[in-house]
A protein has these predicted regions:
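Flexible "arm" and connector segments at domain edges
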Residues: 1-162
Length: 162
């Protein structure tokens, strides 16, 4: 099992959040699908606003939160992360980021672990290749803040390699 998914599953268990048994791969209910899609779209919007503002830490926070939301959807289903290559290269234009984020989020309307995995993989890839940050460390910080129920998003500036 993917280490980040394992951490999300442990967080869900600690708060008694509903999730299928690992490996069950149950289909999301329509309402679960709508709820997860709303979260993904909200996080996608936050990333685009951060890109517009040029705030690297906020972009990283958005990418990590979006990746977390994708992992949470996979955990709810009892699925596993499916590794797939990310087909994005920095072309100097942020519009390419907007397009690929929007496309990957939209594909999650299928409710498939494969599509949620693609969003998670894209977030990790963009964090490393576009932001030049430590996605693993940033996600760990986000999960720890959720575990302690911090309301304010943690500062991820230490996760940037600059």
């Amino acid at each position: 099992m993917n280490k980040h998914l394992q951490q999300v599953r442990e967080l869900n268990d600690s708060f008694s959040l509903p999730q299928a048994e690992q490996g069950a791969n149950v289909r999301l209910t329509d309402m679960d699908l709508v709820a997860h899609q709303a979260l993904l779209m909200e996080q996608g919007s936050q990333i685009l606003k951060a890109i517009k503002a040029g705030e690297m830490v906020d972009i990283l926070t958005g990418l990590v939160n979006l990746g977390y939301c994708a992992l949470a959807a996979i955990a709810t289903q009892g699925g596993d992360v499916i590794d797939s290559p990310v087909n994005w290269k920095h072309d100097g234009f942020v519009v390419s980021i907007m397009r690929i984020l929007s496309d990957k989020i939209n594909q999650c309307t299928s409710g498939s672990s494969t599509d949620y995995s693609a969003v998670y993989g894209l977030c990790a890839h963009l964090s490393r290749r576009f932001i030049n940050a430590d996605f693993d460390k940033a996600l760990q910080i986000i999960i720890e803040s959720k575990m302690t129920r911090q309301l304010k998003a943690p500062d991820l500036s230490d996760c940037l390699y600059e």
